[in-house]
Amino acid sequence: MVDQAQDTLRPNNRLSDMQATMEQTQAFENRVLERLNAGKTVRSFLITAVELLTEAVNLLVLQVFRKDDYAVKYAVEPLLDGDGPLGDLSVRLKLIYGLGVINRQEYEDAELLMALREELNHDGNEYAFTDDEILGPFGELHCVAALPPPPQFEPADSSLYAMQIQRYQQAVRSTMVLSLTELISKISLKKAFQK
């Protein structure tokens, strides 16, 4: 009788574990979405995106290594330290890509985001989300299904024209925020060496 009761309870435990995992996933996605949405300029948006990407990659890299305290303190931390061989985000990305933890599209998207952020660090110009210098690279990201097409502007009515431009900029920005939220969430929720 006790065995039957335990068998009956097990599916509920699995359900509650799945629900807890789904809630954690949703909470993480919400945090990423909020942080990306807070960036009002292209520069702040990309800085935040690469910071979140770095956090996601760091979680994956740590899964690859042993978990005992001695190994972490004396072997893993020096590798990941700023001047260690895995101190650079690009090197950590290559490691998890080479180990098959992330796929080629995720790897290429991460590298492109880092390159775009680096380019903006050296460029003193402020760009809008709809500038060609931003739309071009974002259009190459695998995580972006499609950027919204530019509307056919009617410059005759200046208030309508301004509204159309603002609406288009917001649509492009929202597409970028949602696409990068999905990319970063997918990477951070991966489990090393599990299919």
From Swiss-Prot:
SUPFAM superfamilies: MtlR-like. Disruption phenotype: Inactivation of this gene leads to the constitutive expression of the mannitol operon. Pfam families: MtlR. Keywords: Repressor, Transcription, Transcription regulation. GO terms for biological process: negative regulation of DNA-templated transcription. Transmembrane segments: none annotated. Belongs to the MtlR/FumE family. Involved in the repression of the expression of the mannitol mtlADR operon. Does not bind the operator/promoter regulatory region of this operon. Therefore, seems to belong to a new class of transcription factors in bacteria that may regulate gene expression indirectly, perhaps as a part of a larger transcriptional complex. Homodimer. Can also form higher level multimer aggregates. PANTHER family: FUMARASE E-RELATED. This is Mannitol operon repressor. The lineage of its organism: Bacteria, Pseudomonadati, Pseudomonadota, Gammaproteobacteria, Enterobacterales.
